[in-house]
């Protein structure tokens, strides 16, 4: 594979090297890198490519659904923004209208993250693929993330720290063990 330019291509690269390696586990289900890639490619067939960069808002309950929607946006012209799953509908509608009306999406953006709003209102921060991907080798070395690593995660990908850890883990060809509720007793089973 040539130069990797988005997160789905990153998954494809790992899939080409270790297709049957576990990528994501939650509850009683598990996806290999091949299965994750094929699931996202199947979703992409149902989408139209955006004519220009545009925001795509994701609000899903399960981390796997958040991840697959995020990956589906890659290479399709959409810049995903994962919203907290518990965001009230009226606030969500107002934010989407505001962001769509006031925000020019940078051409090089591959994703946007929403600030927590501690300063009074939520803001969007755009990220390029390279801004995270090029740092993952250093980050993974610091935290000893290898293809054999298994990272236990809990919580929404709307939280930027979780999204970064997911992508760093996947960039190493490692495995994510995800739970939607905080209960370390569940991790013992995985």
Language-model segments: residues:
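ATP-dependent adenylate-forming carboxylate-activation enzymes
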Residues: 60-61, 81-96, 174-190
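Conserved AMP-binding/adenylate-forming core of the ANL superfamily
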Residues: 2-3, 12, 17-50, 89-93, ...
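Hydrophobic alpha-helical segments in the ANL/AMP-binding
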Residues: 11-13, 64-82, 139-141, 160-172
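Conserved pre-ATP/AMP-binding loop-to-beta segment of ANL
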Residues: 2-7, 19-22, 100-114, 130, ...
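Conserved AMP-binding/adenylate-forming
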Residues: 45-86, 153-156
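Conserved AMP-binding A3 loop
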Residues: 110-137
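Conserved AMP-binding/adenylation subdomain of ANL enzymes
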Residues: 133-150, 158-190
């Amino acid at each position: 594979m040539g130069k990797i330019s988005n997160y789905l291509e990153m998954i494809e690269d790992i899939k080409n090297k270790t297709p049957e390696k576990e990528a994501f586990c939650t509850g009683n289900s598990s996806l290999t890198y091949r299965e994750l890639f094929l699931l996202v490619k199947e979703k992409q067939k149902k989408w139209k490519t955006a004519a220009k960069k545009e925001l795509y808002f994701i609000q899903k309950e399960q981390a796997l659904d958040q991840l697959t929607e995020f990956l589906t946006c890659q290479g399709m012209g959409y810049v995903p923004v994962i919203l907290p799953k518990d965001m009230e509908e009226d606030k969500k509608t107002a934010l989407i209208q505001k962001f769509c009306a006031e925000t020019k999406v940078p051409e090089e953006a591959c994703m946007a993250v929403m600030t927590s709003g501690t300063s009074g209102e939520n803001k969007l921060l755009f990220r390029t693929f390279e801004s995270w991907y090029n740092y993952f080798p250093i980050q993974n070395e610091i935290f000893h993330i290898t293809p054999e690593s298994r990272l236990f995660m809990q919580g929404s990908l709307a939280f930027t720290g979780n999204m970064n850890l997911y992508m760093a883990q996947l960039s190493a060809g490692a495995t994510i063990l995800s739970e939607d509720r905080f209960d370390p007793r569940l991790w013992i089973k995985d």
